[in-house]
Amino acid sequence: MLRKSYIFTFLKYTFKPKSQGEKMKKLIKFSLFAALAASFANAAVYEIDPAHSSVGFKIKHLSISKVSGNFGKFDAVIDYDKNAKELKTLEATIETASVNTQNEKRDEHLRSADFFNAAKFDKITYKMVKFEKESDTEGKVVGTLTMHGVTKPVVLKFELGGFTADKNGKEKIGFSLEGETKRKLFEIGLDTPEITLSDKVELEIEVEAKEK
């Protein structure tokens, strides 16, 4: 009993504020910690389901039609806060050599030094900097795209598809991302004139991910 009383006395002495200013500092620190803890508690981390996700693009050919393509190998870290209804983290990695336009000869050319130079720049990455919420299901992902050794800002339109549970009871999230960029910003295909291949590239991404 004496030992217990001593411990309580020690703790009381240790954490008892010595002044009103110190008391306020402790209160502010505690409030910040509580807010941070609540934020982490509400956010969920998801791992991407590649079988039900896609990273696609479209680019105009000869100024009259669009060629579609995609990257077959990719991964992402996704953190979504259901209470705040906003994306907290999005970091994606794409294997450059996995580019696929349904034409092997063209794909080999895209992997070459004329375009992506996949042997030297084997990864394409996208990292979210901030999320601008527009509604409970829509917003803008402001981030940076690193490709071909060049990093540029790219904004993607976010649209939440919704939530469900898989057969094992794990929660799944689905959302779409759309945006555009310019290949010449990343020094890709600089010798290819725009009359042959447009500078603008449309980005179309579909994500289905499972809670970890």
Model segments located where?
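Intrinsically disordered, low-complexity Ser/Thr/Pro-rich tracts
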Residues: 1-2, 40
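Low-complexity, acidic/polar, glycine-enriched regions of mature
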Residues: 43-212
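Hydrophobic h-region of N-terminal signal peptides that target proteins for export
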Residues: 34-42
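Sec-dependent signal peptide recognition
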Residues: 25-33
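Short, Lys/Arg-enriched N-terminal segments with co-localized hydrophobic residues
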Residues: 3-23
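Generic secondary-structure transition motif, activating predominantly at the C-termini of alpha-helices
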Residues: 32-35, 114
